[in-house]
Amino acid sequence: MEYLFIQFAGFTFGKSASAYATPWQGFPGNISSNLLGGQNTDTGTNNIQYTAQFGNGVSATIGLDDPTVWDRTNVYNLIPSLALNATLGGNNAYAGTHAPDVVGNIRVDQAWGLFQISAAAHEVNASYNSLGLSGLPAVAVTSGSPGGASEPSGHPDSRWGGAVMAALQIKNLPTGAGDDIKVDASYAKGATKMVIATSGTSPSFAMFGGTSVAGAYQSIGFGATTDAVYLPVANGGDGSLHLTEAFGIRGAFNHNWNPYWSSSLYGSYSAVRYDGTAKAFICANYTTPSKAVSADYICNPDFNVSQLGLVTRWTPVKNLAFSAEVQWFHLDQMFQGTALLGPSGPKPTTRYEFKDQDTIQLQVRVQRNF
């Protein structure tokens, strides 16, 4: 069940859209659920919120969201024994939830359109420096369950991150009745789910393609989505959480050709950035001698994602719609050179070129509302 809540006297209790979200969530014009660039809680999140109405379409909402399921990505512990895999994936070292996300918005919703400013505060907390049954804190082991050496090894201090978003909808366009433009822009630090968001959990990326480099089997591009990374002092780090930054923008122009046909042109741009210390820790973990990297190899975990799509809908009768969507997806990764990698099967362990990747997806949907 997506939404289940009760409302009275301005309060909302239950599973509903976050107070941070826009009315269109992650769907300014698209039908696919993977348009990045901002937050999306269209399947609902457990929350408590209060809305004050000031008249003339002006309102303010403040709420508490449960971040456990939908508002967290990953925290990487970069000790050498927890090695990042071939596509920069790591073991998630997020600790348990200590505090809810504090979220809110100020909204103006009038005949001309809508304007909204949202903000969120999100706590990032990590598990122990070492997970294992025995040994000193400096001896990192790969067990995924806390053991006798875990608590004495300590853990990074929790840090608070957050996000802000500005959203705009313009109605009554001269292009036709019911046409509108929707756009929102977001920035997050330690709350990457507010930018790299889908209807499910935040994705990390691993894509393969062709190559023209001699000796390389294929090309590979990847991007790791995290809220923070850390390297314990006992393993040569500073023991602190380094919060990941992300920013994005997405929007759509929605046009009605006639009462039965409509189209939406939409797009987005998203970026994930690691600070200099985080990059050094990630690259030290990833760039092992076994990868036999090329002379022109550069390690940089930052990445960007661009999306552009078109949807056309036919509504022959009320509450019945046939839709077709085509979307281009571009992954702009920052690694360079080649390396000997062992991705998961069926891909072989061999030499790959680091390269940007593209794909196109087609989606067809029939929707009947009752």
Q: Language-model segments: what does each one mean?
A:
Residues 2-4, 44-48, 100-104, 162-166, ...:
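Hydrophobic, lipid-facing positions within transmembrane beta-strands of outer-membrane proteins
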Residues 1-83, 96-114, 170-172, 185-187, ...:
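Outer membrane beta-barrel
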Residues 1, 39-43, 95-99, 155-163, ...:
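Transmembrane beta-barrel outer-membrane domains
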Residues 10-11, 22-26, 51-56, 69-74, 103-112, 126-129, 166-178, 191-196, ...:
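Outer-membrane beta-barrel proteins
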